[in-house]
């Protein structure tokens, strides 16, 4: 029986790989719109990757520009080409999984920023993840535990809990994981990383009250995937628990990581938002286009 189950799952994954490989990559890249020092700029690069402008600082969160995620072909082009990013002050990585911590992208960011302005950015990672990024060229590595704060110039960064796991391979379960809330004097933004729905959304909202929430909506089928990922409806409930003004969905439409129809997450999110009466607060961003919050 076990062998039958293994063969069935291997066959399903093989179909996922073949479908990814045979699907034509779509989308286009754009130059990011630049925000003023008093504005919050949010640019969706794809998957869980964002270029963020806040408090006059430039950040990348979970940057991944890979054409292939090991055997899975990227289905949509990055919304911003790596070489078109301005010099970055900070890079935040939510956890060590390959779709969130992409070493070649991180190495290129450190190199390009150092070339443009003479100094590589600081990289912020969860506890026990620093060794993975230690030789990528960053000027400083900051490791954080949940609820720990790090101040950089005019920003405060808080590492927040999530319901996921942090191992990059099979035995390194000591690695941390979570999300981040980044706050300036005027704006705040929350990136959840990967997470299932959990009571922590309410606690994050109570403690930090983020203005904008970047929440994952894909990789929820089969049902047991929801032990570590949010469905669209779960993500919307997390948004309501947080009490944020706006939600921006992520973790969908870039890599085929699970077995729901590829276009289903966004459709279900829009239906759930309409039912809850918050459609005007759920902003699905096109890759490469910048949303400016005044």
Enumerate the language-model features and the residues they cover.
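Cap/insert and terminal regions of metallo-dependent hydrolase folds
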Residues: 90, 121-124, 128-131, 198-286
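Active-site-proximal beta-strand elements of phosphoester/diester hydrolases
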Residues: 41-44, 58-62, 156-162, 188-194
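Short gly/ser/thr-rich secondary-structure transition/capping motifs
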Residues: 41-44, 70-78, 193-195, 229
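Metallo-beta-lactamase
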Residues: 16-37, 125-187, 267-294
